[in-house]
Amino acid sequence: MATELRRKLVIVGDGACGKTCLLIVFSKGTFPEVYVPTVFENYVADVEVDGRHVELALWDTAGQEDYDRLRPLSYPDSHVILICFAVDSPDSLDNVQEKWISEVLHFCSSLPILLVACKADLRNDPKIIEELSKTNQHPVTTEEGQAVAQKIGAYKYLECSAKTNEGVREVFESATRAAMLKHKPKVKPSSGTKKKKRCILL
């Protein structure tokens, strides 16, 4: 029997953007109706992709600023990062670029990143649309999410709704596939300098 693969996934994003609900629906199959801010939680889920069985450790994190110094403890030995935002919160997508991508690249520069839109079921919710219109905002569109994913160099962009379970499995199957890739550190060559080539002796 093939050795079971183990991979570690860390999920980050603004507080209340839907990270914990996404993990609970995937790992336990139930949607938590009461919001309890996360401090630090771990879940384990078995995922089968492309005929391979993977034990996926899911590390939930707190998005609130109070935990900015604690959160980096989650990153070591990770294989893939999910950066989440909420479709009903354009500000949470702004923070992907303003805060989350720089933090993730600082601690996990060589890992694949998936950008995940949570609460996709609220995109056409009349109450949400009305509420956001008061501040000249609108629910995040798929195109806006894809544009940010491209800008931050995400491995993939996905949308899901933990409440309806739509797209949830796809998020973690894609993340597991990404976690199984062989990663090379992303090196940004500074302007005016040439990349150093490594010599291989045969």
Swiss-Prot record:
A motif (Effector region) lies at residues 35-43. Gene3D superfamilies: P-loop containing nucleotide triphosphate hydrolases (3.40.50.300). It is found in: Cell membrane. Residues 200-202 form a propeptide. GTP binds at residues 13-20, 60-64, 118-121. GO terms for biological process: actin filament organization; positive regulation of (1->3)-beta-D-glucan biosynthetic process; positive regulation of cell integrity MAPK cascade; positive regulation of mitotic division septum assembly; positive regulation of primary cell septum biogenesis; positive regulation of regulation of ascospore wall (1->3)-beta-D-glucan biosynthetic process; regulation of actin cytoskeleton organization; regulation of cell wall (1->3)-beta-D-glucan biosynthetic process. InterPro entries: P-loop_NTPase, Small_GTP-bd, Small_GTPase, Small_GTPase_Rho. The modification Cysteine methyl ester is found at C199. One of its GO terms (cellular component) is cytoplasmic side of plasma membrane. A lipid is attached at C199 (S-geranylgeranyl cysteine). One of its GO terms (molecular function) is protein serine/threonine kinase activator activity. NCBIfam families: small_GTP. This is GTP-binding protein rho1. It comes from Schizosaccharomyces pombe (strain 972 / ATCC 24843). The gene is rho1.
